[in-house]
Amino acid sequence: MNIILAKPRGFCAGVKRALLIVENALKIYKKTIYVQHELVHNQYVIETLRQKGVVFVEDISDIPNNSIVVFSAHGVSKKIKKKAIKKNLTILNATCPLVTKVHLEVSKSSKNGIETILIGHRGHPEVIGTIGQYDNKKGKIHLIEDIEDVNQLTIKIDKKLNFFTQTTLSIKNTQSIILALKKKFLNISGPKKEDICYATTNRQNAIIKLSKITDIILVIGSKNSSNSSRLSELGKETGVFTKQIESFSDIKEEWLKNKKNIGITAGASAPDILVEEVIKHLKKLGFKNPPKEMLGDEEKTIFKIPKNLNVQN
């Protein structure tokens, strides 16, 4: 019985940057570090930071004036930022640079009064933050989730129209939505390359490859992790038995019955230690062969943190 690891898997550059910002802030400041929303969507990571004294809040109003706040990797709306400034908070922005790029484009559309369409999942913090970059009352930003939303969409002025996407969507589904938009609105413009990030793309491509050489796939990632959920959905679409788990304790032995090759991947916010624990658990259950890593993309992207947060080792 074999264990095959997807490549790439686990932390992306945006998550690594966000974690480094908080870890360094804990070393530099002698005050409580507050984080608006979960820094990244992984319960293990959040609990680890909580044990170090980090306080997570959903409402910026719950943070005392003159405190230190970290904006999560998902980004925040302009309103949240204004509230933080009004409370005289020291802002440490851990927003993923790829999300910031989308924010800047949406803000530009807003400034120019161009109606804008955002493809994304309703209620996701990244989507809330991105929609919150559009504040021109003369224009409008529309959120769509699927092709049915495209069919029902009504635009006042479609001579100039822009679209953008959440960074953690299914590539396949998003491409079909974009095609539907371009078919309905001939003058629509979008980014040269869709906003889905490199890490999301690489992990989705990897799970497709993994599905061809395994008969079960375990996706490690929290339930509220968008990119992990997309990986799980994609694994199921390939026809391979796929389960999304938070940790090794979620694994049921019945899943492994008559399985010879078990594939493991992890969402962009899931740490390596969770993968290691799953491997250790599987070995106890009979998967004795050393795990093999499949061939895949080598990720070399690094996002720098603010200079004032650099810590000398």
UniProtKB/Swiss-Prot annotation:
For this UniProt record, the keywords arranged alphabetically read as follows: 4Fe-4S, Iron, Iron-sulfur, Isoprene biosynthesis, Metal-binding, Oxidoreductase
Q: Please tell me whether the keyword Isomerase is annotated for this protein.
A: no
Q: Which reaction does it catalyse?
A: isopentenyl diphosphate + 2 oxidized [2Fe-2S]-[ferredoxin] + H2O = (2E)-4-hydroxy-3-methylbut-2-enyl diphosphate + 2 reduced [2Fe-2S]-[ferredoxin] + 2 H(+); dimethylallyl diphosphate + 2 oxidized [2Fe-2S]-[ferredoxin] + H2O = (2E)-4-hydroxy-3-methylbut-2-enyl diphosphate + 2 reduced [2Fe-2S]-[ferredoxin] + 2 H(+)
Q: Where does [4Fe-4S] cluster bind?
A: C12, C96, C197
**One GO MF term attached to the UniProt entry:** 4 iron, 4 sulfur cluster binding
Q: Does the keyword Iron apply?
A: yes
Q: Which cofactor does it need?
A: [4Fe-4S] cluster
Q: Which residues bind (2E)-4-hydroxy-3-methylbut-2-enyl diphosphate?
A: H41, H74, H124, T167, S225, S226, N227, S269
Cofactor: how bound: Binds 1 [4Fe-4S] cluster per subunit.
What pathway does the UniProt record associate with this protein?
Answer: Isoprenoid biosynthesis; dimethylallyl diphosphate biosynthesis; dimethylallyl diphosphate from (2E)-4-hydroxy-3-methylbutenyl diphosphate: step 1/1; Isoprenoid biosynthesis; isopentenyl diphosphate biosynthesis via DXP pathway; isopentenyl diphosphate from 1-deoxy-D-xylulose 5-phosphate: step 6/6
**What domain of life is recorded for the organism?**
Bacteria
Q: Which GO terms describe its biological process?
A: dimethylallyl diphosphate biosynthetic process; isopentenyl diphosphate biosynthetic process, methylerythritol 4-phosphate pathway; terpenoid biosynthetic process
EC numbers, comma separated: 1.17.7.4
User: What is the active site of this protein?
Assistant: E126
Residues that coordinate or bind isopentenyl diphosphate? H41, H74, H124, S225, S226, N227, S269
Protein task: Catalyzes the conversion of 1-hydroxy-2-methyl-2-(E)-butenyl 4-diphosphate (HMBPP) into a mixture of isopentenyl diphosphate (IPP) and dimethylallyl diphosphate (DMAPP). Acts in the terminal step of the DOXP/MEP pathway for isoprenoid precursor biosynthesis.
Quaternary structure note: Homodimer.
Homology family: Belongs to the IspH family.
Protein's recorded name:
4-hydroxy-3-methylbut-2-enyl diphosphate reductase
**Organism of provenance:** Buchnera aphidicola subsp. Schizaphis graminum (strain Sg)
